[in-house]
Amino acid sequence: RLKEKEKDCYAILKEIDGEKIVGLYLVNTYDYELEPDLNLKFKWNESGSSGGFMLSLAIYDRLIDDDLTKGRKIVGTGTIDADGNVGEIGGVKYKVMGASKSHADIFFCPKENYEEAINTKNKYNLKLKIVKVETLKDAINYLKNN
């Protein structure tokens, strides 16, 4: 249940080639009440929106009794919104190669990045299964049924 939604704006001042530049970073923060209570910890260098989808999938997997992974190594990327829609990211080819290098079985990919992911898989003859997803529910259904 969504308890609270907050918008934050951060400004960053940088100097590049003697010129001062201001960058703005807008963030939507959602506060949900969960049962059971979850406590998440992150390393200092883990940030960015491209892990939102997989974080959501990991949380879902912890909240249910079933084992969605069934012993498979599952990797993926994509942003996620409050409605569970998975959004595109940059650098998917590097993420596909990294997933293959770590011996992943399944790589979940936003639909907007799917063609690039498949091209990377074919170009380097990678063995992992690339699955196109539009929503968190797509990934859950795939894992339950495959």
Model-derived regions: residue spans:
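Peripheral, non-AAA+ core regions of ATP-driven protein-machinery
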Residues: 1-146
